[in-house]
Amino acid sequence: QYLKGRTLDELKATTANDAGLWPDDHEGFLDSRAFYAGKTASDGTNRYIWGWCPTRPGNDNTNVGANPNEPEWAGNLVAHKLIQHEDGTLTLGAVEGIDAKYAKQGEAAVMAKSDEGVTEAGGTYTLTGDAYLLFSRLNVHNKISFTVKTASADDKFGLSLCRGTDSDKYYSIIVNPEGGGKRKINFEEEGPEGKGFIDGIDGYVFNAPADNEYRVTVYTDNSVCVVYINDNVAYTNRIYGNQKNCWSVNSYGGTVEISGVDVRYY
């Protein structure tokens, strides 16, 4: 089902008395507030959408233009592939041509880890409590892939960029439990001098996977960052300073398994 209307009144009429007819997932969103003015086109087989990722005044990752302000409406183009699921819902995924560009093998060595809460067996890491793994420095254009298996639907985990062993602040994309088997991507400035949760740039609510497995792929191109999870979640943000810096995977109080860590670049 899709909403169609030639005028605003016609569009409103299509939604009258429709309680229960439309799925609540995604709340009508395809991406974060850092993707705007999207247009779509087809290659005859697949449909794609491209739009803009806004810049941040003063290159400040926390100055996202939260309500009542507005983001800095300028920036760089971001493209996604539109995915239509069996129930008719739409999500966004990676564009094959963009993915293929990240062809060079990068380094994914563990440079540091939390003093407690990290074990490793056969290339799979288990993080327990407030734990992290810090990986080697990224390039300028990066593709980061890994799989997270949580012990429950309420275990919290995330990825941090611009992070070192003694950073006063760094920037985290966190898969946060929202209760009732729901999740949401939050953006936080962590560290001793960090502001914590950044309002106005969190993602949309989505269902936790039944098997608690999250296949995460992150693309960075200079300061533009796009995250995909399970072909079901897309999240775009602008994160200055991620180039040539280390990155980490984190747990927050629960137990998560990290496997298949891979870094590519061009």
Task: Enumerate the language-model features and the residues they cover.
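Beta-rich carbohydrate-recognition and catalytic domains
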Residues: Q1-D31, C53-K113, N222, N232-V233, ...
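Secretory/extracellular carbohydrate-interaction modules
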Residues: G122-G191
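Entry beta-strands of beta-propeller and related beta-repeat scaffolds
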Residues: N46-I49, L90
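Short tryptophan-centered beta-strand motifs in secreted/extracellular beta-sheet-rich domains
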Residues: I144-F146, D211-I229
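Beta-propeller and closely related beta-sheet repeat lectin domains
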Residues: Y36-K39
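Ligand-recognition surfaces built from glycine- and aromatic
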Residues: Y2-L8, I239-Y266
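Short, aromatic/His-centered strand-loop micro-motif at the edge of beta-sheets
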Residues: G191-R215
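Beta-strand-rich interaction surfaces with strong enrichment in secreted/lumenal proteins
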Residues: D25-G28, A131-R137, L159, I201-A208, ...
